[in-house]
């Protein structure tokens, strides 16, 4: 038995060392989670306006179009649980913060990194949970899988490692103010039919199922919005709940009931808190095809600039 265990250990040790080395090398690769943390911790003294939310904000609102000292801290796939946690952690380290622009996607009120079975073919976002734990020191559990990028993301990690170390391509496309340029117009699908044909599937993936879990998450996320509103209210910070624009084919085919419930939740928060305002651009017809990367994301170098200028006029016109 001892000989067997010794043999197992002998063969396992190289694999363990290889895994540790691979994990270490993964953590040296630039990523938006680490960079957004850098902005919060190293530029916190300067931040007057911050943009939060998921990819619709991270790719779609250009902070350079807004007043001085605006930073885009939104991250793709960041839902309300982490929006709230990020603010709770950092808001008292941002002494000059006056405004928060919160970009809210069509599916956001029903989304949670820890949940599955709410959308068509969705799953628990273990990789994002791990990224928050490792790179932003924000965690809601003590699971080992969420302490390792390799264990949580698997194939995605191998692809990222290959992209950085073998192909020498960018793995992080944020500019100095935090805008993520992954969705620049030059990166968009050139065949118009292909990106238009992808919109119906996107809508299907973004439409919540009619079940008890979806309703529970919806109610939880409303409470998270109220918690963020209170956090801002107690510190004299204005909160702007912004619904970004979507392409015509997208907004004409979404579930009207879900859309109205999204509006209802946002209005509820805006009506309760005197520091909160809501802005709806969901069906804004000022945006054309080149402004969009896909059905519900603006191009980072074209649409995000236009949207940033519109927000400057609407929010900061005084």
Task: Enumerate the predicted regions with their spans.
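Active-site segments of SGNH/GDSL-like serine hydrolases
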Residues: 229-254
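Short hydrophobic beta-strand that contains or immediately precedes a catalytic carboxylate
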Residues: 49-53, 298
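Membrane-embedded segments
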Residues: 56-145
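Hydrophobic membrane-insertion alpha-helices, especially the h-region
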Residues: 6-24
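Secreted/periplasmic serine-hydrolase-like ester/acetyl group-modifying domain
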Residues: 113, 117-235
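Alpha-helical transmembrane signal-anchor/signal-peptide segments
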Residues: 26-46
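Structural motif
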Residues: 48-50, 99, 238
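C-terminal regions of proteins
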Residues: 31, 257, 261-318
């Amino acid at each position: 038995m001892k000989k067997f265990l010794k043999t197992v250990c002998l063969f396992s040790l190289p694999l363990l060392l290889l895994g540790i080395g691979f994990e270490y090398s993964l953590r040296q690769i630039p990523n938006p989670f680490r960079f957004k943390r850098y902005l919060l911790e190293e530029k916190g003294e300067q931040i007057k306006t911050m943009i939060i939310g998921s990819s619709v904000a991270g790719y779609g609102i250009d902070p350079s179009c807004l007043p001085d000292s605006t930073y885009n801290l939104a991250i793709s796939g960041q839902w309300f649980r982490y929006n709230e946690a990020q603010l709770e952690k950092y808001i008292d380290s941002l002494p000059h913060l006056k405004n928060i622009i919160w970009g809210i996607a069509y599916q956001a009120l029903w989304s949670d990194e820890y949940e599955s079975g709410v959308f068509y073919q969705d799953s628990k976002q273990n990789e994002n949970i791990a990224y928050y734990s490792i790179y932003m020191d924000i965690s809601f559990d003590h699971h080992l899988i969420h302490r390792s990028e390799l264990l949580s993301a698997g194939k995605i990690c191998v692809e990222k490692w290959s992209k950085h170390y073998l192909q020498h391509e960018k793995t992080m496309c944020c500019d100095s103010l935090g805008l993520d340029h992954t969705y620049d117009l030059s990166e968009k699908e050139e065949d118009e039919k292909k990106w238009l044909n992808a919109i119906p599937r996107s809508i299907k993936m973004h439409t919540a199922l009619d079940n008890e879990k979806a309703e529970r998450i919806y109610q939880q996320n409303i409470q998270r919005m109220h918690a963020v509103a209170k956090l801002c209210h107690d510190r004299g910070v204005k909160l702007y709940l912004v619904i970004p624009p979507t392409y015509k084919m997208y907004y004409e085919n979404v579930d009207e009931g879900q859309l109205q419930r999204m509006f209802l939740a946002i209005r509820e928060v805006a009506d309760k808190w005197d520091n909160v305002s809501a802005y709806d651009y969901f069906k804004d017809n000022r945006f054309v095809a080149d402004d969009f990367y896909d059905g519900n994301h603006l191009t980072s170098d074209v649409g995000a600039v236009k949207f940033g200028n519109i927000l400057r006029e609407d929010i900061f016109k005084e």
